């Protein structure tokens, strides 16, 4: 079933178009990279749509506004965790903005898992969010494991019941290895496999 989706010309074209956008992000400036990081901070414990809308509400203010302003904007656009995420955005900006691309690029170019480990030092960034960020700036060797991917793996019999809200690091890596095996069998990168599964589960390619 998934193989036929991967081989579907229309779906494949849409997925590869999105992949090209991620590859362009890899060549983009620090502002684009920090925007992608902010999106991943907002996506944690929220839907992608909610996070994307919140990011658009914030606009360029992610680069300079204080915590109170960011909190107010998030609240006004009905983003749920406006207090916590405003704090995380400011903390991330103070910690990495201006050197994010410079520090992550050489790591990710040599070892994407090491780059992910580095990103875990940012408050609010977990395994999923770090993997999501790296995929969105053009690195495709890590899995973005959310409830959609877990539901998919459970349905095909690859895993049993799992509580996605309490996923340990070791369990995440174990699930990632399952997805990498599936991706290898389909001759695609696991970060690209994610887009096909996302499309299968949601009928969209917006991640």
UniProtKB/Swiss-Prot annotation:
SUPFAM superfamilies: DNA-glycosylase. The keyword Signal does not apply. It catalyses: 2'-deoxyribonucleotide-(2'-deoxyribose 5'-phosphate)-2'-deoxyribonucleotide-DNA = a 3'-end 2'-deoxyribonucleotide-(2,3-dehydro-2,3-deoxyribose 5'-phosphate)-DNA + a 5'-end 5'-phospho-2'-deoxyribonucleoside-DNA + H(+). The record marks 207 as: Important for guanine/8-oxoguanine distinction. GO terms for molecular function: class I DNA-(apurinic or apyrimidinic site) endonuclease activity; hydrolase activity, hydrolyzing N-glycosyl compounds. Coiled coil: none annotated. It comes from the Archaea. The active site is at 128, 146. Keywords: DNA damage, DNA repair, Glycosidase, Hydrolase, Lyase, Multifunctional enzyme. Its EC number is 3.2.2.-, 4.2.99.18. InterPro entries: DNA_glyclase/AP_lyase_Ogg, DNA_glycosylase, HhH-GPD_domain, HhH_base_excis_C. One of its GO terms (biological process) is base-excision repair. HAMAP family: Ogg (MF_00241). Catalyzes the excision of an oxidatively damaged form of guanine (7,8-dihydro-8-oxoguanine = 8-oxoG) from DNA. Also cleaves the DNA backbone at apurinic/apyrimidinic sites (AP sites). Belongs to the type-2 OGG1 family. This is 8-oxoguanine DNA glycosylase/AP lyase. It comes from Saccharolobus islandicus (strain Y.N.15.51 / Yellowstone #2).
């Amino acid at each position: 079933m998934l193989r036929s989706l991967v081989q579907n010309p229309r779906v494949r074209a849409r997925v590869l178009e999105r992949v090209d956008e991620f590859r362009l992000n890899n060549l983009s400036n620090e502002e684009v990279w920090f925007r992608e990081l902010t999106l991943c901070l907002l996506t944690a414990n929220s839907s992608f749509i909610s996070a994307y809308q919140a990011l658009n509400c914030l606009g360029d203010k992610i680069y300079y506004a204080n915590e109170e302003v960011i909190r107010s904007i998030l609240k006004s656009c009905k983003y749920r965790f406006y207090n916590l995420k405003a704090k995380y955005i400011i903390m991330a900006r103070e910690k990495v903005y201006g050197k994010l691309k410079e520090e992550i690029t050489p790591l990710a170019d040599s070892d994407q898992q090491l780059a992910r480990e580095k990103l875990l030092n940012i408050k609010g960034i977990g395994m999923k969010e770090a993997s999501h960020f790296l995929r969105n700036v053009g690195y495709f060797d890590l899995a973005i494991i959310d409830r959609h991917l877990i539901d998919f793996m459970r349905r095909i019999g690859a895993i049993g019941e799992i509580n996605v809200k309490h996923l340990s690091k070791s369990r995440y890596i174990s699930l990632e290895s399952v997805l990498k095996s599936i991706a290898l069998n389909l001759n695609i990168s696991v970060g690209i496999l994610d887009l096909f599964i996302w499309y299968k589960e949601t009928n969209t390619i917006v991640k």
